Amino acid sequence: MEKYSINGVSLLKNEKAIFPMMGEFHFSRCPEPEWEEEIRKMRACGMDIIATYVFWIHHEEEEGVFDFTGQRNLHYFLKLCEKWQMHVWLRIGPWAHGEARNGGFPDWLLKKGYKLRSDDPDYLALVERFWKKIYKEVEGTHCILGIQIENEYGHVGGLRGAAGEQHMCTLTKLAKTIGFEAPYWTATGWGGAVLGDLTPVMGGYCDAPWDASLKQLPPNKNYLFSTVRNDGNIGSDYAPGMELSFDKDAYPYLTAELGGGVQVTHHRRPRVTAEDIGAMSVCKLGSGCNLLGYYMYHGGINPKGKLSSLQESTAVGSFCDVPELSYDFQAPIREYGQISETAKELKLLSMFAHDYGETFCNMQPQFAGDDCESTSVHTGDFQDAEDLSEFRMITRRSGDRGYLFVNNYQRGYEMAEHKDVMLRVQTADGEISFPKQDIKNGAYFFYPFNFLLSDDVTLRWINQTPLCNINRKLWFFYGNEKMQYEADEKLSGQVLISMDRIWAKYAWRMKKYPNILFFSALPILETENGIEVICRSDRAQKNCWIIMDATVEDAKTWIDNGWKKPDIIPDFLHVEGDASTICVLSHDLTAADNQTVASFTHTDVNNCIIRKEKNVFHRAEKTDFSEAEVCAIDDTGKDYQEYVIRISYDKAYDAAKENIFLQIDFQADQAELYLNGEKIADQYYIGDVWEVSLKRFDFPTELILRLYPLEEDDKIYLETQPDYVNGRCCSLKDIRCVYEYKEKL
């Protein structure tokens, strides 16, 4: 039986350090029929733990009327996580935040007049009743690894000091008395929040859409290597951040709210990239973090309320307005399950953590000092994010082994380029020097030194970042420099395989196939009986590759299922060592031609043709078969512009297995989609093409698109500006249909 514990450095499994990856996914913000596939996606992207809130208002919107059915069915969600061997970190509140109405408190609770978030007996009685309902959902499941009590308590509301500590202890005791059990019990620790004897988890975001500023924010400190774990800017719309209420050195550095993206607000709309999240994550790794936990990892859509909408808004006392429905969060997996470039970026770190986490967890950060030859060398803890010329570097090591981290990325700002940098590390056996290289703006990476390949072979250095290994024989690295290394002995049965960063992001590791590394620009998921590729008509790819350990894996099984052995190793791989120990196979994918497109202006009526042949959509001229019409509705006297979208589908279309995404390229304040008079989707403009799953809504044949005008002088911070005409914009630039299907491998 697995035994989980904790020490002052890391989480432990059977007395060995572990470095898990955790991603937030709110089950009640996703339709129940989609849960299993979305769990499989998170597993494929390298997540080990799914964190989720249990929003009180989602389950008891009306006092005494509990709802744990449909997309609120917590028990079924937990059983699916269990099925796919995913742990769960349950955030039971009672207060949550999560951009939910009242922070997750039902309206009726606020009207009671009780002293909420305190030891008020009347309040605690209602908490106990709610938690007992949650516990009934938890009973019979075996996947809960951690439980978080409250959220941002003593920082965003709640009591401070001794009274706050006492309340957190009261809640923890209540939960355990009810019957909740978990190896780990946590509380958010940033901003001066109190713990009540719980383990603190930290956070950090690349931007602050809750900030009142309507300008670009100063350089973010989350892009520094630093001993500072506290991001006091989180929740600064409620209260200014304060110093930590605990001794950070007494606890491992664990995160639960590294922003996988950010949720845009009406007044502030950052546009997040994969590199924004990747560079921030590398800085946390270098600074000593031993659990990367992302909020959000999977976006969602707010459920429909019985009495009101369920989003945070200024109308109910919040400081920000967010979309009524969309909780996309620009997350690694988007609100309709689209796997983004951010997910692929973070997958680089999950593969590293899974294969090297045990030793990495016991390595401590040591700041650069004299370990670098550069135009500017830092000699201590990094504090000034506004210094864009400083060379940011740190080593994380145990004795003479470790990793050298470099970050020359600062979201929204240009860092100075550093020419001919020789990275150096001091060890007991002398200085380790890496080949000179230019560190350009936007670069971030980490290199190993004294990297153990076997009992006999150590890489003294290599100018590549470790990705993963297979059976400690095939060692995969990536980087944009040509691979160079120094080993203390000749490679014996060891193979070093390097690739550039793009191909590394195409790597997929399946728990079902531990001796194989898959390569595909398209997502690869495990199924109950094998694997499948998620193909899209706008992301063409000719083939997939696998690399396996030829000494333990039988290639014949794969060849019998359509995989082919190429004559030479593909040119995206650079191999050092005995290549006979590796087997490379490729598989041709069904070609995906151009997606269906409809381009139109405000006054034109255009047809969007959807035609299907051999499971693929093609662009087609206007004919008598399947079409989607888009036409403008008279907007005279209205403060919005509307369009009717009429769609018909090919009869051969397999709705059970395939999907169509409606891509809407608009420039306006916000867009809304209506089906049969009911709003089903919405989005604030940030500069991205908006994607909506038509399968989610049972492939509707008619939709209404509504756009609201954006004025150039509106009090809104836009990172990406639209095209204004006479100080105004409210236009539909383009609309397309993208076909998605799965191919079994």
Tell me the role of every PLM-derived stretch.
Residues 112, 124-136, 143-145, 154, ...:
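Carbohydrate-binding surfaces of carbohydrate-active enzymes
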